[in-house]
């Protein structure tokens, strides 16, 4: 959940660099949890890292016996040094940290629009709260856009003064904007605190995205069971939180690998502390459905009741989360 605007502008203005990748360079967000930079970002320090997860090197060589000098690539080495050295120089020539919050708000809008489009009449409360979220987000988006344009103008002026050798005026402009940068970094930290959550696979999402996904999966599982399609129901339940473990392990192992996530000291969980929204325990539903499938038993009344209660719980949590975003976090 990160700004890409400045980096894209930086890439567009680069001179000819060493050609190492046929696909050239692209910018992705958010930072993934495997990177140390994730911990820096959620602590309020804007950060970035080179992404190598999509290439064959990550799959076949990284952290293996092949990760050695024999596979050194001169072009890649040079490109990384050129690219990131120039980026450091570019950032050094800004008077204010170039943070643009409009991509965050665009993603909230997209999620809100999806929820509004799919909610049924029985979910009028969600629809009403989501419409409010969209309204507040659109207002915040306009302010964020204006703020970034002002920051960009300041940095353009600062760069010009440095290029002219007018150090006295450049230093004055830099000093005048310390409070602006301070407020931007405060906003960045708030963004990380309020919006950065992770699912049980370490993927980064907004809190309402995780809840909305669970609601959809639970609704699909209910619909499947009502049609006696136990295979489809199990397929959906498998994707809810950490319930994949219920299919593969006994209850002790399931609870161990679920509970230990929540029962760690805070100083051991810097990157993930408070980022999980919770866990919908469907262990007994899974085991009962697997048993009934084996025995050709199609009486799913107990499982349907439990799943519907879980659905209601996730819906209440979604309403609370959407309200928090609308009435607090975007103000």
Name each region found by the language model.
Residues 1, 328-329:
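Conserved small/polar residues in nucleotide/adenosyl-binding loops
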Residues 1-61, 73, 123-210, 215:
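Metal-dependent peptidase/peptidase-like ectodomains
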Residues 57-109, 231-239, 244-266, 279, ...:
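His/Asp/Glu-rich mid-to-C-terminal helical/loop segments that flank catalytic regions of hydrolases
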Residues 96-99, 116, 120, 145, ...:
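Residue-level signal for secondary-structure boundary elements
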Residues 107-131:
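Extracellular/periplasmic ectodomains of large secreted or surface enzymes and adhesion receptors
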Residues 227-228:
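Phosphate/adenylate-binding glycine loop and adjacent helical scaffold
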Residues 274, 294-296, 300-301:
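Sequence-level signature for long, low-complexity tracts enriched in small/hydrophobic residues
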């Amino acid at each position: 959940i990160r700004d890409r605007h400045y980096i894209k502008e930086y890439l567009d203005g680069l001179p000819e660099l060493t050609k190492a990748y046929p696909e050239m360079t692209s910018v992705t967000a958010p930072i993934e949890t495997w990177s140390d930079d994730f911990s820096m970002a959620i602590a309020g320090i804007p950060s970035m890292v080179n992404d190598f997860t999509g290439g064959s090197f990550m799959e076949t060589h990284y952290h293996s016996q092949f990760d050695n000098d024999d596979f050194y690539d001169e072009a890649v080495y040079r490109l990384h040094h050129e690219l990131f050295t120039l980026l450091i120089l570019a950032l050094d020539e800004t008077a204010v940290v170039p943070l643009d919050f409009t991509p965050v708000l665009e993603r909230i809008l997209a999620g809100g629009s999806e929820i509004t489009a799919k909610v049924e009449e029985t979910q009028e409360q969600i629809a009403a709260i989501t419409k409010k979220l969209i309204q507040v987000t659109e207002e915040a988006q306009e302010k964020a856009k204006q703020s970034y344009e002002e920051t960009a103008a300041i940095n353009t002026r600062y760069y010009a003064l440095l290029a002219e050798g007018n150090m006295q005026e450049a230093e004055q402009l830099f000093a005048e904007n310390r409070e602006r940068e301070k407020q931007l970094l405060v906003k960045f930290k708030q963004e990380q605190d309020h919006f950065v959550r992770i699912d049980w696979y370490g993927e980064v999402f907004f809190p309402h995205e995780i809840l909305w996904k669970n609601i959809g999966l639970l609704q699909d599982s209910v619909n499947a069971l009502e049609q006696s399609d136990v295979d489809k129901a199990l397929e959906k339940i498998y994707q809810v939180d950490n319930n994949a473990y219920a299919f593969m392990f006994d209850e002790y192992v399931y609870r161990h690998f679920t509970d230990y996530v929540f029962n760690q000291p805070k100083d051991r969980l810097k990157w993930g502390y408070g980022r999980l929204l919770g866990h919908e325990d469907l262990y007994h539903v899974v085991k009962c459905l697997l048993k009934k499938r084996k025995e050709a038993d199609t009486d799913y009344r107990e499982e349907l009741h439990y799943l519907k209660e879980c659905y209601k719980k996730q819906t209440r949590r979604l309403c609370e989360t959407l309200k928090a975003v609308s009435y607090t976090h975007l103000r």
